[in-house]
């Protein structure tokens, strides 16, 4: 079959490449700025077996916890959300006994905390609860331990859901029960105090002002965020340049300077910044 001309061909590859490059937009090295950061501080009040009274030896822990509460309460950039009291009894001893025990530990801990907060004139909501048998805590501690027959104990927990049967099956593993009684179970007899609070960051106005007047007062996330508060490329460039000086080991400011240069049509300058970003990433 003889060749038949259909149409004149064109070489469009170079044109397509140029169009693609012309429309390309390098990725921004984004900040991780959070105005409100949630934090917490924990402390454990420990109890003796089958006891719910708070011993004098535990008052030091309570005092240190209250000191942290006071520090957060007094800080201008922090706000207390609440204080949690989570009281527990270890799984040995039976459900009925441990229910009463855990409830009494919760009540005694909450009373102590309320008294301390009132004395310090701190108004903070308290959320209290108790867990009669802390099987979750037991499983976690056993999992992290190196005790004999660990896998057998964990298998018992997965096989039986009834607490009385669990306890009996574990007691039947006589070779390890004394170790559990000495090393694991005492850690579960506790009231956990949890101070939940927020760290409140600078406002947009504060960040924008500091970025131009005193950028050294800003951390890297705040400084990178400051550049997003303006649409002026010149101001963005100034902020990113300052960020490279304060935080030379963070690639994002170099990357973002490269992005600005590329968008301005300065490919050589953009390439230089991108190479620098790659070298510190």
Task: Give the residues covered by each predicted segment.
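N-terminal targeting segments with Sec-dependent signals, encompassing both cleavable signal peptides
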Residues: 1-281
């Amino acid at each position: 079959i003889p060749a038949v001309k259909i149409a004149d061909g064109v070489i469009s590859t170079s044109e397509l490449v140029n169009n693609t490059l012309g429309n390309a937009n390098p990725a921004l090295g984004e900040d991780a700025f959070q105005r409100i950061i949630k934090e917490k501080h924990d402390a454990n009040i420990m109890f003796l077996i089958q006891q719910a009274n708070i011993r004098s030896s535990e008052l030091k822990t309570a005092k240190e916890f209250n000191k942290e509460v006071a520090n957060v309460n007094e800080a201008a950039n922090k706000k207390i959300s609440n204080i949690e009291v989570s009281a527990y009894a270890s799984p040995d001893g039976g459900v009925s006994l441990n229910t009463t025990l855990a409830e009494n530990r919760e009540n005694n801990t909450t009373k102590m905390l309320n008294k301390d907060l009132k004395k310090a004139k701190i108004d903070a909501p308290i959320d209290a609860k108790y867990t009669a048998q802390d099987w979750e805590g037991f499983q976690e501690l056993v999992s992290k331990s190196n005790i004999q027959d660990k896998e057998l104990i964990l298998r018992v927990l997965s096989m039986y859901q009834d607490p009385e049967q669990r306890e009996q099956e574990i007691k039947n593993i006589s070779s390890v029960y004394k170790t559990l009684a000495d090393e694991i179970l005492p850690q579960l007899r506790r009231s956990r105090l949890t101070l939940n609070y927020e760290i409140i960051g600078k406002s947009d106005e504060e960040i924008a002002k500091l970025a131009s007047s005193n950028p050294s007062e800003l951390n890297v996330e705040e400084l990178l965020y400051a550049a997003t508060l303006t649409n002026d490329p010149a101001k963005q460039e100034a902020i990113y340049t300052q960020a490279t000086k304060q935080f030379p080991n963070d690639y994002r400011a170099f990357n973002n300077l490269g992005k600005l240069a590329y968008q301005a049509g300065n490919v050589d300058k953009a390439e230089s910044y991108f190479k620098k970003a790659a070298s510190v990433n």
